[in-house]
């Protein structure tokens, strides 16, 4: 966190009817959940709710992170389990989900299932590039439901690059 964010979270008691959410990324590869500075900053925000962003597109896992698909799942699940052990409500923000689903349906579905099994209260499906059309979003979510995924624990994080964020959120 930076000083401005820290000051904001220090004032959280002033917001009687709001639920603040600390946002950060999963632990980094090669670090434990207890020794990852970024994850520690999310915890130290003092919120009851945390949203973690993690990769759900195999291309980004292998090229941007330079790790295996299984190693990425371990980053996600261990981070979620750690936060749940601290009593946090956890939202997992599945970055590049819709592009990842189009490229490797099996892996993207496994990310959602593993995050939920690890204890994520919500899995938020991201149209990170903002290029999805409403039909694609609807068909993807229908596929997840057919795979036995609990739709009541799914959210959407639609970007508006093609002016479809509202339509995609309603799809």
Give names to the regions the model predicted.
Residues 159-171:
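Thiamine diphosphate
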Residues 19-24:
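A glycine-rich helix N-cap at a beta->alpha junction
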Residues 1, 7-15, 28-154, 170-171:
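Alpha/beta enzyme core
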């Amino acid at each position: 966190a930076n000083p401005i964010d820290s000051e904001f979270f220090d004032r959280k008691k002033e917001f009687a009817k709001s639920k603040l959410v600390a946002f950060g990324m999963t632990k980094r590869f090669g670090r434990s959940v207890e020794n990852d500075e970024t994850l520690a900053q999310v915890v130290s925000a003092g919120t009851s709710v945390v949203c973690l962003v993690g990769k759900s597109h195999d291309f980004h896992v292998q090229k941007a992170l330079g790790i295996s698909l299984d190693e990425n799942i371990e980053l996600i699940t261990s981070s979620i389990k750690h936060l749940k052990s601290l009593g946090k409500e956890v939202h997992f923000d599945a970055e590049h989900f819709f592009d990842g689903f189009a490229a490797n349906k099996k892996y993207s579905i496994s990310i959602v299932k593993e995050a939920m099994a690890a204890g994520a209260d919500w899995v938020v499906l991201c149209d990170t590039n903002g290029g999805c059309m409403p039909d694609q979003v609807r068909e993807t979510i229908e596929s997840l439901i057919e795979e036995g995924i609990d739709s009541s624990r799914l959210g959407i994080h639609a970007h508006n690059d093609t002016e479809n964020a509202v339509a995609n959120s309603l799809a």
